[in-house]
Swiss-Prot record:
Xref: PROSITE patterns: CARD (PS50209)
Lyase listed as a keyword: no
Residue ranges annotated for the CARD domain, each copy included: 1-90
Gene Ontology molecular function, alphabetical: CARD domain binding; caspase binding; cysteine-type endopeptidase activity; cysteine-type endopeptidase inhibitor activity
Organism: Homo sapiens (Human)
Superkingdom field: Eukaryota
One GO CC annotation: protein-containing complex
Swiss-Prot/TrEMBL keywords: Protease inhibitor, Thiol protease inhibitor
GO biological process: inflammatory response; negative regulation of interleukin-1 beta production; negative regulation of protein binding; proteolysis; regulation of apoptotic process
Signal peptide: none
Covalent S-S links between cysteines: none
InterPro entries: CARD (IPR001315), DEATH-like_dom_sf (IPR011029), Pept_C14 (IPR002398)
Lineage of origin: Eukaryota, Metazoa, Chordata, Craniata, Vertebrata
Subunit structure: Interacts with pro-CASP1. Interacts with CARD8.
Gene that specifies this protein: CARD18
Name of the protein described by the UniProt record: Caspase recruitment domain-containing protein 18
């Protein structure tokens, strides 16, 4: 369910998220062992624009299944409540 919701809201996330939120999400997801250090480095270092980082991050998380997506949504609500609200995640 959570993975389907994120897929539907993918475009809003990509176009609206800021660099600070992406970095905070990466830290939280690494701490929760949703992503690996390698995944984190891939998002941060292999993408030039914030939109590219956002695209890779949301695709990475949705590919890991509903539990990972729930953790992503929880952290997004904490780190950027405005964006979470815009995405209809509250």
């Amino acid at each position: 369910m959570a993975d389907q919701l994120l897929r539907k809201k993918r475009r809003i996330f990509i176009h609206s998220v800021g660099a600070g939120t992406i970095n905070a999400l990466l830290d939280c997801l690494l701490e929760d062992e949703v992503i690996s250090q390698e995944d984190m480095n891939k998002v941060r270092d292999e993408n030039d624009t914030v939109m590219d980082k956002a695209r890779v991050l949301i695709d990475l998380v949705t590919g890991k299944g509903p539990k990972s997506c729930c953790k992503f949504i929880k952290h997004l609500c904490e780190e950027d409540p405005q964006l979470a609200s815009k995405m209809g995640l509250h």
